Swiss-Prot record:
Gene designation: Bacc
Protein name: Bacchus
Residue ranges with Acidic residues bias: 99-152
Tissue expression per record: Expressed in the brain.
Keyword hit for Nucleus: yes
Amino acid sequence: MSAATEQQNNGDVAVEKVAADDVSAVKDDLKAKAAAEDKAAAADAAGDAADNGTSKDGEDAADAAAAAPAKESVKGTKRPAEAKSAESKKAKKAAAADGDSDEEEALEEIIEGDSEIESDEYDIPYDGEEDDIECDDDDDDNDDGSGSDDQA
């Protein structure tokens, strides 16, 4: 073997060794995660088995309190009623009343015909002649004489 080939082979072996080490590290990591998940599942099962409905009232209350997650208030999800001031309520009512009057005025303008658009803009002249379209009865080979042109 030449020196270059030997060096290349040694490099390839080193790369393969690093890759094998990485694979074994990943496998070990997956095994550790699986073991941790198994322990968590076993702890959950033990907690469920501890209180299978046979405990007396008040017994294992500490265990139940520890197992139940604490309720935390989430800010911004609900607005307390005290936060709304009387002035804001009055302002909303006044705005709603003003909005109704604007809508009524718009409806009156439509009904009365007050429009900013001139009617001449929609007059389209027709330069062609109107042709009367007549149906030819020549192709009524299947006419049974009943007067109905429905196809059967």
